[in-house]
Amino acid sequence: GLIDVRCYDSRQCWIACKKVTGSTQGKCQNKQCRCY
């Protein structure tokens, strides 16, 4: 789901998602990170 992390590209979300969900699957959507 969406996490409270601002982003400009999906790479910024990989680390953030790994911290939150343990998964590096994520993308930047509307300047906010979405983790899978």
Curated annotation (Swiss-Prot):
Domain of life from the UniProt record: Eukaryota
Site (Basic residue of the functional dyad): K27
Keyword annotations from UniProtKB, A to Z: Calcium-activated potassium channel impairing toxin, Disulfide bond, Ion channel impairing toxin, Neurotoxin, Potassium channel impairing toxin, Secreted, Toxin
Keyword Ribosomal protein: no
GO molecular function: ion channel inhibitor activity; potassium channel regulator activity; toxin activity
Main subcellular location of this protein, as a coarse class: secreted
Annotated domain remarks: Has the structural arrangement of an alpha-helix connected to antiparallel beta-sheets by disulfide bonds (CS-alpha/beta).
Summary of the function given for this chain in its UniProt record: Augments responses to direct muscle stimulation probably by blocking calcium-activated potassium channels.
Family per similarity comment: Belongs to the short scorpion toxin superfamily. Potassium channel inhibitor family. Alpha-KTx 16 subfamily.
Name of the protein in question: Potassium channel toxin alpha-KTx 16.5
Organism whose genome encodes this protein: Leiurus hebraeus
